[in-house]
Regions:
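Solvent-exposed beta-strand/loop surfaces, strongest in extracytoplasmic domains of secreted
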Residues: 1-186
Length: 186
């Protein structure tokens, strides 16, 4: 409504567009079995896909999970896994980012070798132990501080033999610390 110095103007619609705000999200991971130390998240390998819960924040404010989708890559075997947060169109925010977590190798389960008791000298090479069994790596042996080998240790001469053994883990299982047993040929 105009006054004596201004004309009347008819109202007209005004169009306003509110754009989504692009953020650089802080991504936090959580979930059963997930540990965090010094900013590094990790699980221990167990053969299952790891899908930690993802929380996204912007300057400390949590962003609704309807704003983004989550996908996982390399999240089954030991190594570094990636969590990708991808924007869902039409929200209040544009949210894109990644986080990583580690899947650490698990200690292998194995049956250790056992020394064969009562061995007597017979002039021929004799196996000194029953074989260790491991399906999550390879059992290797060393006789009297020699090189490690997958061959079952043998001895011929009368005496005491020191057998060191360990498991060389596979891609998802760690190596074990060497252990020692002694066997005698009388």
């Amino acid at each position: 409504q105009g006054d004596s110095n201004h004309e009347n103007i008819a109202p007209s619609p005004v169009s306003v567009t509110i754009s989504s705000r692009e953020i650089t999200p802080a991504i936090t991971l959580s979930g059963s079995g997930l540990t965090e130390a010094n900013g590094v998240y990790s699980y221990i390998y167990d053969g299952t896909a790891k899908t930690p819960t993802v929380t996204v924040t912007d300057n400390g404010d949590e962003i609704s999970d309807t704003e983004y989708s989550v996908s996982y890559r390399d999240n089954v075997n030991a190594g570094t896994a990636t969590v990708t947060v991808s924007d869902n169109n039409g929200g209040n925010y544009i949210v894109n980012g990644t986080a990583t977590f580690e899947i650490t190798k698990k200690a292998p389960a194995f049956t250790p070798p056992a020394g064969i008791p009562g061995l007597q000298y017979n002039g021929e090479a004799q196996e000194l132990v029953t074989a260790g069994v491991c399906y999550e790596g390879t059992v290797v042996y060393s006789v009297n501080n020699g090189n490690y080998s997958t061959a079952i240790p043998v001895g011929t001469a009368v005496g005491t033999y020191t057998i060191d053994y360990k498991v060389l883990g596979d891609a998802n299982h760690s190596d074990t610390v060497p252990a020692t047993l002694t066997v005698e040929i009388g």
